[in-house]
Amino acid sequence: MSKWLDNAIFYEIYPQSFKDSNADGIGDFQGIIEKLDYINELGCNALWINPCFESPFGDAGYDVSDYCSAAPRYGTNEDLKRIFTEAHKRNMHVLLDLVPGHTSVEHKWFKESMKAKRNEYSDRYIWTDSIWEEPEGMGCIRGISDRDGSCVVNFFSHQPALNYGFYKIDRPWQQSMDDKGPRNTLEAMKDVMRFWLNMGCDGFRVDMAGSLVKNDEEGKGTIKLWQNVREFLDREFPDAAMVSEWGEPDKSLLGGFHMDFLLHFGPSHYNDLFRCDEPYFSIRGKGDISEFVNKYKESYEKSQRKGLICIPSGNHDMDRLAKRLNENELKIAFAFLLSMPGAPFIYYGDEIGMKYIDNLESVEGGYDRTGSRSPMQWDNSTNAGFSCAPSEKLYIPVDISKERPTVEQQKADDNSLYNEIKKLIKIRKSYKSLQSKGEIEFICAEKHKYPFAYIRSFENEKILVILNPSNNKQDFNCNLTLKNTVYYFGEEI
């Protein structure tokens, strides 16, 4: 695993909403470059940039029409390369968002695959043999091509699924992972990875990583596929980092990923922390962290230290943290996020407590996710400093509430969420026990009870973390000898 991941703290950038440098209402590469110092000053030393490739943007860029060309609305390939260069000057690393499971219907591969006459792309996607046959248990598109067949889709109906084969074959049109079509698809995706890694990218966050091989309930085929990719990367790009959207670390890390996310879907109980009716990190003190801890311990033991289990503050698919938590609750939530093993991921704006905006019209397939994708709030100038464009031209409307937080206001307030997170990041970087590879031992995580406590350790260094998000004082007994306090916030336990 790349050495730089030992102390990596990631910042997720949704590029169209981060910073607009040319007044067209859409964030861009130059805007990201202008704000690298801000991210670096916060303490984050790595970026994850959401899809920024050519796309008709039916799903905000997760419908790629050309994997090797930057979307013109953000800039050029050279502009993106400059992000890599400028980040590296600041000892920062950059992950791009790879979408290997499907493309847009506008991709040239799909246009060729739709043709009735066989060609090199005929098996690049998953097709049935007849337009009258629908793939069981999978969505499809049909009746849009000369080719006789229905094409499997992964998500929206304009996102045809790329063909990596079937682990278990039960229909004549299904191909095995070892057939020529699936093997060519995998090699084509390796070529995409080569292209960007050679340009200076440091690795990839991989979209829907656990779903590439079909009829693969236990994930054995998909694990084998990613092990193949890991061999290729270790051979050609040994420092490239990979994080998966899988949500099952024992499978992802076995497949060769360095990191896997705990997510709002899957078995992790991640939602119990911040995104349920009674979150554990709410002041009401009615939450339960025990199920999360049980699943975390299970994943931690199964993963056998093959990689990192990452707990994000949020992402572009989730409600914002601040939808359910107030500023003090957020401070304690970040004390948790920044003291756990794995690499922390901070979604842009979460560090200032940006709100989820209700009742926004869907933009580019966002639907109820749109409220978490509003423009970054830099200051109280026009459009919160995001863009000089007329407000009606903005990609998504900016939060217009009077109490909206801004970077400018938060930086000026010593007691702000931003400054608390900055302090927590500095502490994390100062103690190896708090970093990615430090061990963890849970010592108090009882059902429906507070506080929550664990010990982080590395060699002879040990740090006890005690968290009581509730509004009630709690007793905590332990037989440890404590030398000094590293960090303290709120009332005494």
Predicted feature locations:
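Acidic/aromatic-lined carbohydrate-recognition and catalytic surfaces
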Residues: 2-184, 198, 209-257, 376
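Short beta-strand segments
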Residues: 12, 48-51, 204-208, 243-245, ...
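Beta-sheet entry/capping signal
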Residues: 45-46, 91-93, 193, 202-205, ...
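A Trp-anchored, charged/polar loop motif used as the substrate-binding/catalytic surface
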Residues: 179-192, 196, 287-297
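Active-site groove signature of glycoside hydrolases
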Residues: 190-215, 309-318
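C-terminal beta-sandwich/jelly-roll accessory domains of carbohydrate-active enzymes
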Residues: 470-493
